[in-house]
């Protein structure tokens, strides 16, 4: 099991450029998005964070800061948070495809897939949660201003 994790991390590190290139071909990026370059940087950063998580160098709480950063960027860009979810799932699919190339045994595969799911579920949950907290603040501020001037 540890060997599968090690090989997966090694493959992702050595093939990072190819991985990101494949991912970029499938993600949603709006032309008007002021953070469109950040999307790729965030993806690269998350790939690195994922490999650190698999190697148990970081825990899930440590990705919450990047979740907040991404939520703020999506809010500022005025794009639907669903695009982030879609792009994240495309990255997850790319990692799963890489795992299957390693041909792990059933039990090894199950354990690694559980870790992959946990990482991405945590990332998506905290990003969407942060996004909606920001939206709630924005809407509250809007109505407060509206009351003030009406």
Where in this protein do the model-derived segments appear?
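Elongated alpha-helical scaffolds
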Residues: 79-97
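General helical structural elements
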Residues: 78, 96-97, 139, 150
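Core of compact, soluble alpha-helical bundle domains
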Residues: 1-70, 102-150
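Glycine-centered secondary-structure boundary/capping sites
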Residues: 78-79, 100-104
């Amino acid at each position: 099991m540890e060997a599968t994790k090690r090989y997966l991390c090694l493959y992702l590190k050595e093939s990072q450029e190819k991985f990101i290139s494949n991912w970029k071909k499938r993600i949603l990026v709006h032309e008007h998005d002021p953070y469109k370059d950040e999307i790729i940087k965030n993806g690269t950063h998350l790939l690195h964070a994922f490999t650190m998580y698999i190697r148990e160098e970081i825990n899930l709480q440590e990705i919450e800061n990047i979740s907040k950063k991404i939520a703020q960027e999506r809010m500022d860009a005025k794009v639907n948070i669903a695009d982030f979810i879609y792009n994240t799932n495309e990255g997850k699919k790319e990692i799963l495809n890489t795992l299957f190339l390693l041909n792990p045994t059933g039990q090894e595969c199950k354990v690694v897939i559980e870790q992959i799911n946990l990482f991405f579920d945590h990332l998506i949950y905290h990003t969407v949660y942060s996004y909606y907290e920001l939206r709630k603040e924005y809407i509250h501020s809007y109505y407060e201003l509206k009351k003030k001037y009406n």
